[in-house]
């Protein structure tokens, strides 16, 4: 299991930013200039049996027991080197040992180094047999990486595995800077286990101690280690001052946990955020349980609620066992509809209208698969909490290709729908869908002829309340049988563009599809899981207008479209444009009176869609799309973006997105589409930028403006300073955080965050721009 990037627990030795490009690489190179490297040939294997070479100005001795060397003494064996003004060499026979024990005492300007560490001090001692080394009242410097300090006594033990410091200190800052350090009465650094143990630890900023712990165990490498991670703090208008102190628990090689006490001043309590990760034979998963024992703000706003406890449970699991079994969980549930408005959480957002709870178990072998699942929804709307869950649902697929010239498939589904309200209709639905295809293709085109039968049976219950309030009545037992016929043809033509762009290739890809589905009146079937599908270019060629099975629209239509692409001499797509339309010979209907455009009796060219992408250069890109629906009498949706991206840290993007109110009303559930905040649709223009503004300084910003409401929708500004041993990030965000139904206006939350990252024990020197961009409520999406 991959461990999160370690940060320095409580004393905070480590890093939490990742970037390997742009200025990050420059900063890493600059930092390594102040770090010594091992510049002698590296000797591999056991070096204890290698000869010892001694150079000095003067030498005298009592052979074979003792020798004294003075004047520029230089002793080498393997990768180890000891230098001093004077060295006394002692050699004694040890009982039971085949080789004599050779030790040295060094005096004056003692310098010891190997491929791991450099030790300096006035006095030293070394065992040439074991490489054990002591240096008194000196300092040390790691070789090839950041890390240095001082100690009353520095010891190398266990073939250089352990560095032991008595009354020592550590910092990853380069020489000449002690911005932060950790000191302790004893520090043991285990290189093999990549851990440092510190007794009586004090974390210092400059000369000032700000934190004490009697014992700390710190991760100093990539191995997973239990301990505190770096704390965080911020201020928001929703919760006022907030402080996080995460603790990482390495439970076992296949599981770990992060426990985070999260203090919120305005809430008057600590939320316990508990994340658990695991890896098993059935797959990998993550669980999160967040719990706030009481919330004084919630108590004031909801005096009639029995409890002010706030909680979230999240579980995600995905895995395969024995190559045939599939297990999937996507489960999110919160204590109340306001949870994501009050608390920032990576498993949900204030813009989410619901949370999903889904479990599924699947079985798959060649030509056959089956899945049993349950799906529920927790709706956050205060206007209508009605929602349907599938409890349970069975999906079965059987494929048999190459039956002569045909491919065949049978799809079956059985599902039971239950509503959260006891007065709403419920149903059991059984669907069977046999399909036969005749695929024909060559190197420049293909045509696929398909026929299928859509047979569905409904057994509906609990209809009295609905039928008493609607003129269109639901039937308890309904059978719906619909044949479907489709012919889909594609061609691909290409030509060299030698005249305009040597080495480039252009394609022309026309496509035409005829679809026929006869009309069946479905007004006696309640809509349990169907909604209008978005008609982008690829969506024009779908079989269905609606998702789900409750509404299958009739079709007698031809869809035509064309795509053109341009590839460079490296076969990289530089440009594409697609445009298409649906021409209806007869009106597309379901018989549902709630679908307003079915009363318009429109035919002809009704739906248009287009998409384009242009990679102008390695740094410039443009992407856009538009969908026009004459049934809605307007542009349904559109989006566009243009981006300049020099590297990971330097980018500027302008974007626009639009959704008409008619489209929202047709696609969203009624309790969302009729809400006040959607009455004018969505029309937002935005800008995102990230750029280093000075040496080691970078800035990130995002701004979105709602042109319908003539007000800001969301904004974010972050500034980060990065150095070799620490980084400081300050951020501000103003984001949409719900809708006030009483006052009929949007509610915003303002947040100011402050974060310190300590660096030096890994290769991470990123400027933090990608992290800040992804943290926005409208996250950055790459156009290139």
Swiss-Prot record:
Protein's cellular compartments: Cell outer membrane
Keyword Nucleotidyltransferase recorded: no
Gene Ontology annotations for the cellular component aspect, listed alphabetically: cell outer membrane; transporter complex
Keyword set, alphabetical order: Cell outer membrane, Disulfide bond, Membrane, Signal
Disulfides per UniProt: 31-724, 173-725
Primary localisation category: membrane
Entry annotated with the keyword Signal: yes
InterPro entries to which the protein is assigned, alphabetical: LipoPS_assembly_LptD (IPR020889), LptD (IPR050218), LptD_C (IPR007543), OstA-like_N (IPR005653)
First and last residue of the signal peptide: 1-24
Inactivation phenotype: Mutations alter the permeability of the outer membrane resulting in increased sensitivity to detergents, antibiotics and dyes. Depletion leads to filamentation followed by membrane rupture and cell lysis.
Modification after translation (UniProt): Contains two intramolecular disulfide bonds. At least one disulfide bond is required for activity, and protein is probably fully oxidized in vivo.
Induction entry: Constitutively expressed.
One GO biological process term: lipopolysaccharide transport
Further comment: The correct assembly of LptD depends on the thiol:disulfide interchange proteins DsbA and DsbC, the chaperone proteins SurA and Skp, LptE and the chaperone/protease BepA. Incorrectly folded LptD can be degraded by three different proteases, DegP, BepA and YcaL. These proteases act at distinct points in the outer membrane protein assembly.
PANTHER family named among the record's database cross-references: LPS-ASSEMBLY PROTEIN, LPS-ASSEMBLY PROTEIN LPTD
Task performed by this protein: Together with LptE, is involved in the assembly of lipopolysaccharide (LPS) at the surface of the outer membrane. Contributes to n-hexane resistance.
Domain free text: Contains an N-terminal soluble domain that is likely periplasmic and interacts with LptA, and a C-terminal transmembrane domain, which is predicted to be a beta-barrel and interacts with LptE. Residues 529-538 play a key role in interaction with LptE.
Complex and partners: Component of the lipopolysaccharide transport and assembly complex. Interacts with LptE and LptA. May interact with LptE during assembly of LptD by the beta-barrel assembly machine (BAM). Also interacts with LptM, which promotes the efficient assembly of the LptDE translocon by the BAM complex.
Protein family: Belongs to the LptD family.
Full protein name: LPS-assembly protein LptD
């Amino acid at each position: 299991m991959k461990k999160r990037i370690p940060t320095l627990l409580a004393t905070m030795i480590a890093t939490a930013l990742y970037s390997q490009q742009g200025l990050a690489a420059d900063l890493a190179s600059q930092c390594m200039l102040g770090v010594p490297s091992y510049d002698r040939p590296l000797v591999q294997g056991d070096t204890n049996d290698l000869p010892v070479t001694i150079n000095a100005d003067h030498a005298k001795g009592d052979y074979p027991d003792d020798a004294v060397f003075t004047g520029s003494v230089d002793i080498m064996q393997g990768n180890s080197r000891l230098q001093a003004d004077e060295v006394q060499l002692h050699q004694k026979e040890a009982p039971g040992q085949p080789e004599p024990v050779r030790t040295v005492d060094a005096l004056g300007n003692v310098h010891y180094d190997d491929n791991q560490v450099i030790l300096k001090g006035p006095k030293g001692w070394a065992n040439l047999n074991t490489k054990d080394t002591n240096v008194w009242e000196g300092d040390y410097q790691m070789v090839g990486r950041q890390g240095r300090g001082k100690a009353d006594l520095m010891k190398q033990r266990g073939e250089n595995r352990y560095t032991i410091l008595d009354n020592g200190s550590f910092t990853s800052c380069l020489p000449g800077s002690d911005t932060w350090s950790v000191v302790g009465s004893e520090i043991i650094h285990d290189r093999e286990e990549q851990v440092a143990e510190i007794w009586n630890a004090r974390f210092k900023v400059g000369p000032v101690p700000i934190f004490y712990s009697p014992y700390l165990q710190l991760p100093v490498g990539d191995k997973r280690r239990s301990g505190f991670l770096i704390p965080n703090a911020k201020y928001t208008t929703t919760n006022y001052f907030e402080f996080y102190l995460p603790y990482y628990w390495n439970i076992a090689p296949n599981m770990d946990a992060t426990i985070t006490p999260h203090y919120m001043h305005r809430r008057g309590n600590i939320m316990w955020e508990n994340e658990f990760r695991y890896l098993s034979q059935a797959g990998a998963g993550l669980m999160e349980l967040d719990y706030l024992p009481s919330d004084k703000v919630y108590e004031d706003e909801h005096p009639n609620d029995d409890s002010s406890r706030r909680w979230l449970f999240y579980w995600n699991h995905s895995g395969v066992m024995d190559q045939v079994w599939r297990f999937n969980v996507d489960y999110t549930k919160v204590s109340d509809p306001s949870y994501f408005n009050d608390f920032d959480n990576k498993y949900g957002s204030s813009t989410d209208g619901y949370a999903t709870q889904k479990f599924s178990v699947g079985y798959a072998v060649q030509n056959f698969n089956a899945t049993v699942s349950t799906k529920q929804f927790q709706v956050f709307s205060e206007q209508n909490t009605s929602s349907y869950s599938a409890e349970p649902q069975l999906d079965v697929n059987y494929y048999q290709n190459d039956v002569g010239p045909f491919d065949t498939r049978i799809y079956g589904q059985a599902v039971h729908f239950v509503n959260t309200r006891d007065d709403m209709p419920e149903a059991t639905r059984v669907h069977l869908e046999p399909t036969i295809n005749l695929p024909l293709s060559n190197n420049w085109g293909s045509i696929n002829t398909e026929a299928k039968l859509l047979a569905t049976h409904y057994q509906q219950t609990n209809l009295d309340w609905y039928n008493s309030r609607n003129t269109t009545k639901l039937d308890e037992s309904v059978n719906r049988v619909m044949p479907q016929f489709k012919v889909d043809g594609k061609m691909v033509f290409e030509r060299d563009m030698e005249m305009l762009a040597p080495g480039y290739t252009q394609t022309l890809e026309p496509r035409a599809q005829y679809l026929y589905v006869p009309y069946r009146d479905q007004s006696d079937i309640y809509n349990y899981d169907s909604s209008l599908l978005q008609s982008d270019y690829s969506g024009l060629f779908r079989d269905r207008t609606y998702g789900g099975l409750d509404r299958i629209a009739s079709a007698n239509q031809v869809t035509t479209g064309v795509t053109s692409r341009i590839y460079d001499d490296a076969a990289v797509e530089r440009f594409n444009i697609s445009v298409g339309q649906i021409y209806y010979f007869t009106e597309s209907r379901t018989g549902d009176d709630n679908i307003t455009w079915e009363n318009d009796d429109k035919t002809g060219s009704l739906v248009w869609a287009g998409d384009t992408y242009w990679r102008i250069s390695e740094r410039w890109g443009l992407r856009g799309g538009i969908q026009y629906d004459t049934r809605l009498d307007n542009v349904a949706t559109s989006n566009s973006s243009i981006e300049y991206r020099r590297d990971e840290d330097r980018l500027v993007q302008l974007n626009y997105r639009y959704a008409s109110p008619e489209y929202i009303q047709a696609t969203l559930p009624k309790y969302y589409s009729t809400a006040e905040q959607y009455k004018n649709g969505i029309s937002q223009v935005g800008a995102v930028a990230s750029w280093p503004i000075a040496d080691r300084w970078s800035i990130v910003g995002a701004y979105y403006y709602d042109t319908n409401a003539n007000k800001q929708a969301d904004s974010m500004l972050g500034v980060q300073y990065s150095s070799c041993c620490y980084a400081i990030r300050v951020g501000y965000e103003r984001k949409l955080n719900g809708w006030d139904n009483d006052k009929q206006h949007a509610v915003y939350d303002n947040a100011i965050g402050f974060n310190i990252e300590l660096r030096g024990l890994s290769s991470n020197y990123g400027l933090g721009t990608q992290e800040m961009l992804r943290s926005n409520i409208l996250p950055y999406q790459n156009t290139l």
